[in-house]
Amino acid sequence: MIEYLNVHGNPNIGVYIYANNKIALVPPTLTEKDKKKIEETLGVEVIETKIADMIINGVMIAGNDNGLLLPRIVKPEELDYLREHIGDKVRLEILEVRQTALGNLIAANNRGALVSPLIDKAILDKIKSVLGVETIYQRHLANIPTVGSMIVVTNRGGVVHPGVSDDEIRILNSVFGVEFTTATVNFGLYFVKAGLVANDHGALVGDETTGPELMRIQQALRLRG
């Protein structure tokens, strides 16, 4: 299933929403209608939260079905709230690195993870352990270090910024164990994560996404209509 969505009129829904196959972390300001659409499309429990008192959950959080990586600026009460509502569904871990926009710097499915070269190599083993992945790889894509913003990957397929090379696509296919396709969202936006939230069950795209863009994403992520 794939559906259109905006957040307060903004088509860049991936900035605000983090999702895996178990939960979706959304701003507390979403309407009940939008929360229901997220729940039904992705087949997950919707949990309202902020990170560091900001509603940009998709930018601040990285993870997969095994673990969530949270920035060092998460507030203690926010962490307590997440632990209470997530329980033992997913491991929660604060990543003690200078960078805080972890969702823009790390992409993961349940098989592999790609990490920005901006993140200290010394922390890679911890990331691999929290996410429980077989493969972790650190590099830029198309000479851009914010690799998490360029990728949306599930356990079924992946989409990536059109500026990447064929060699880089082959690397992504190997790291994540799925096939990648270049794609855009929201009428030509290359940084696909900004306008796309997806898991193995479904996807939500920003409401400025064109029909051809939607079809390409749907095929790449191997989703039903």
Swiss-Prot record:
Record-linked Gene3D superfamilies: L-arginine/glycine Amidinotransferase, Chain A (3.75.10.10)
Annotated keywords: Initiation factor, Protein biosynthesis
The protein's role, per its UniProt record: Binds to the 50S ribosomal subunit and prevents its association with the 30S ribosomal subunit to form the 70S initiation complex.
Name the UniProt record assigns to this protein: Translation initiation factor 6
Family under the similarity heading: Belongs to the eIF-6 family.
Listed Pfam families: eIF-6 (PF01912)
Biological source species: Hyperthermus butylicus (strain DSM 5456 / JCM 9403 / PLM1-5)
UniProt-listed GO biological process terms: cytosolic ribosome assembly
Gene designation per UniProt: eif6
Classification via InterPro entries: eIF6
GO MF entry, a single one: translation initiation factor activity
